[in-house]
Amino acid sequence: MDIQNIKETIAMIEEQNFDIRTITMGISLLDCIDADIDKAAEKIYQKIVNKAGKLVEVGNEIGHELGIKIVNKRVSVTPIAIIGAATAADDYTPLALAMDRAAKEIGIDFIGGYSALVQKGYQKGDEILIKSMPKALAATERVCASVNVGSTKSGINMTAVRDMGETIKIMSKGDKWLNAKLVVFANAVEDNPFMAGAFHGVGEADTIINVGVSGPGVVKRALEKVRGESFDILAETIKKTAFKITRIGQLVGQMASERLNVEFGIVDLSLAPTPAIGDSVARVLEEMGLETVGTHGTTAALAMLNDAVKKGGVMAAERVGGLSGAFIPVSEDEGMIAAVNSGALNIEKLEAMTCVCSVGLDMIAIPEETPASTIAAMIADEAAIGVINQKTTAVRIIPMGKEGEQIEFGGLFGVAPVMRVNKASSADFIARGGQIPAPIHSFKN
């Protein structure tokens, strides 16, 4: 084995903020369906505790053995709207409480799956879940929610988009954490290990392990060694670095699945930043030659980074999936926060960047007076980007405070500067409701 590769791997862990961001166990709750919501809640609690009871212990063991920090151990479950639909209940909060109780029992920080898939319309459980979302998220500490409002095959459910704008607005009157735990998707994936948007798809195995890695600091350090070189060398350097990062994720996932006796799912190839210095996707883009993120060239730099990460990572993992690419959350990235505060980065540029990367408008604070119709229109724009380009896009926004203020979350969630939003109205557009049809290129059969 090449000694230089060993040295580089040690440096990744000790000096460059490399870590495994999450080991996420996906658990099917289809066998927990019951006409009695209280019985369903108890079944949900029991299954999560039985399946994931040793998840934290095993994750800590593996981290200690390999000398790698495994930051989060998490669980995702079948979209709760599917489970709740079998009951006569008009509020699914008891199911969220069961999830929360199980999460506390097994010692995980978040559990995802208080979710609904409504890309082509509402079923009985979907509307109930969305209406109960403000109450359910307020009543729980660790439950995360998501709603898929569009897909390339189905188009965009604009009625659901309107409803989600109103839901986010309602939740903004409560704790700042409520909207930090809600993601609105287009083309949501079934094997996402990252919160808050993780849920366990109905096409997945009963129980699986998915892994998400984090390595912006490692990529930046590698690029520092090729300053001034051509884009060809830049891309090759990112690919080689992504291979090393993903290889460790593959190893951790295999070890976890063997010890928990659970099928191994995927490694998510995403570069996930944190607010820590040296762990920023924005600083990687600036290392490519941009004075600051948000200037002209930012979208091209991000596109190349995203593509090179995928090309390098796909060779290192048995199976890849999830969101896979570079995350650009504002509050969770020290470089993004700095760019917003300097005036170099605005929501319009962030929207352009989402055309070429993994997710969307993520962890962005907007003024609290922003109307629900404007929030819905922002969701519609992101959904359109995803649907037309056959990729996952999402919105996680926090209406709070006044433009220019800083919303302090702390920990991995960081600080969100309140960003300017276009004040022109989209109300009549959003009021239409109905369905934006699927694009012509979605028709492939």
Curated annotation (Swiss-Prot):
InterPro entries (alphabetical): UPF0210
Complexes and interactors: Homodimer.
Family, similarity comment: Belongs to the UPF0210 family.
Record protein name field: UPF0210 protein LACR_1020
